[in-house]
């Protein structure tokens, strides 16, 4: 009996399975066909034999003893034409986690994560990093937003919509992830504080080494009696996060030594966001198929729409509470709602058994779709209305300048030039004094 196609009880409802009668005829176990082989012909009495093919036959014997059949599609021992009974189970196909497409997808997800983290490291300027370490406002905001607001929001949404344990773990994992490069791009488009955006993204990524497994452990207690939470691979999650430090460190080194190359890598990593999402949607949809995609509950789609929107709103409210300037409010808003979906996808793909996650592997992709669409709407509204209102100023005199340092510099220059001014009357008086001497 081949056990390669066996799946766990949790994932069994999503897959078709075949069963075969065991040789001792006392237990029904998983297998590749359904067979009652013909017994020996010792003694009178008919014995019914059903083979996997489209036929049936009778063989003599007082007490039929079932044996494993070796017949193929040809039927039983005494085939007499096609059987009037339809075959209840078709030959079992490979599960999606054993297909070559899934193995290729694993490689693609790992490569996309490395490119993203390399680009993230290339945004770090070592000369400016020390100032943020001495005044860690950005790091504190990142910790509060990414590991305070978002995990709590994901936990409350999972409880409110009564998600099962698999969907709840996928939502929690996405909510506990750090910020991604999308927030840096969107902050640039809304004239945000880029230094704050970069330091929040970097800080949340580094803090995720400790806080992400901690948040998963805290908020998963609501489903502690379920198999997937009992087998929650916190060590593998931490190891995956640690592996992201290598491309980040390489990116910091490239920025320090070769700044022009770092600028090129940042552009490539930003454009790779779009390519990664498109390829992941196509490959995952092809691999899972319509049956598994249809098994995603409607509540998961609602959470994927509402969760980034609530993250943007809570981030803006937190920045308002701290009385930050408008450009910093927009930055914190985008940093809170934008998650590193490449990291979330990689953890779901590489750390969890695929038979446990199933179609919930699609949740971070759905989240990425809606977080990008909602952030794009926010940028569009800002470009149409917000930029004009924020840059509107009162009419000033021609000589009036709002830059205090520049005004002071002009006053000093005017004072310096007055010291060197020589008038014609003074020249005549000096010449008269010299001739009298």
Swiss-Prot record:
Belongs to the bile acid:sodium symporter (BASS) (TC 2.A.28) family. GO terms for molecular function: bile acid:sodium symporter activity. This is Sodium/bile acid cotransporter 4. Keywords: Cell membrane, Glycoprotein, Ion transport, Membrane, Sodium, Sodium transport, Symport, Transmembrane, Transmembrane helix, Transport. The chain crosses the membrane at residues 104-124, 141-161, 198-218, 234-254, 268-288, 292-312, 361-381. The keyword Ion transport applies. One of its GO terms (cellular component) is plasma membrane. GO terms for biological process: bile acid and bile salt transport.
């Amino acid at each position: 009996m081949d056990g390669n196609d066996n799946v766990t009880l949790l994932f069994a409802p999503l897959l078709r399975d075949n069963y075969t009668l065991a040789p001792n005829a006392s237990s029904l176990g998983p297998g590749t066909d359904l067979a009652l082989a013909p017994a020996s012909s010792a003694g009178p009495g008919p014995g019914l034999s059903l083979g996997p093919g489209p036929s049936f036959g009778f063989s003599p014997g007082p007490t039929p003893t079932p044996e494993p059949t070796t017949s193929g599609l040809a039927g039983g021992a005494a085939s007499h034409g096609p059987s009037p009974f339809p075959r209840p189970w078709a030959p079992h196909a490979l599960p999606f986690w054993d297909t070559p497409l899934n193995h290729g997808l694993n490689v693609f997800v790992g490569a996309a994560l490395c490119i993203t983290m390399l680009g993230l490291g290339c945004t770090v300027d070592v000369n400016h990093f020390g100032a943020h370490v001495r005044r860690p406002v950005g790091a504190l905001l990142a910790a509060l937003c990414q590991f305070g607001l978002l995990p709590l929001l994901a936990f409350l949404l999972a409880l409110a919509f009564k998600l099962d344990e698999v969907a709840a773990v996928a939502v929690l994992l996405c909510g506990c992830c750090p910020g991604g490069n999308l927030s840096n791009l969107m902050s640039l488009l809304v004239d945000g504080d880029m230094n704050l955006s970069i330091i929040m993204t970097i800080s949340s990524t580094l803090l995720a080494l400790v806080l992400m497994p901690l948040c998963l452990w805290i908020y998963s207690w609501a489903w502690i009696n379920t198999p997937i939470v009992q087998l929650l691979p916190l060590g593998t999650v931490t190891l995956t996060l640690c592996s992201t430090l290598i491309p980040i460190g390489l990116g910091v080194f490239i920025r320090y030594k070769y700044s022009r190359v770092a600028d090129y890598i940042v552009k490539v990593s930003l454009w790779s966001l779009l390519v990664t999402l498109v390829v992941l949607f196509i490959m995952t949809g092809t691999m899972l198929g319509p049956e598994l995609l249809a098994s995603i509950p409607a509540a998961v789609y609602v959470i994927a729409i509402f969760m980034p929107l609530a993250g943007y709103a809570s981030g803006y409210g937190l920045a308002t509470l701290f009385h930050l300037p408008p450009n910093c409010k927009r930055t914190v808003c985008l940093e809170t709602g934008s998650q590193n979906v490449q990291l979330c996808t990689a953890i779901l793909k590489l750390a969890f058994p695929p038979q446990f996650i199933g179609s919930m592997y699609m949740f971070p992709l759905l989240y990425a779709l809606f977080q990008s669409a909602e952030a794009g709407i926010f940028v569009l509204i800002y470009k149409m209305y917000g930029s004009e209102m924020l840059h509107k100023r009162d009419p000033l005199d021609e000589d009036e300048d709002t830059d205090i340092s520049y005004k002071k510099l002009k006053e000093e220059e005017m004072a310096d030039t007055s010291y060197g001014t020589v008038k014609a009357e003074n020249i005549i008086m000096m010449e008269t004094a010299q001739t009298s001497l």
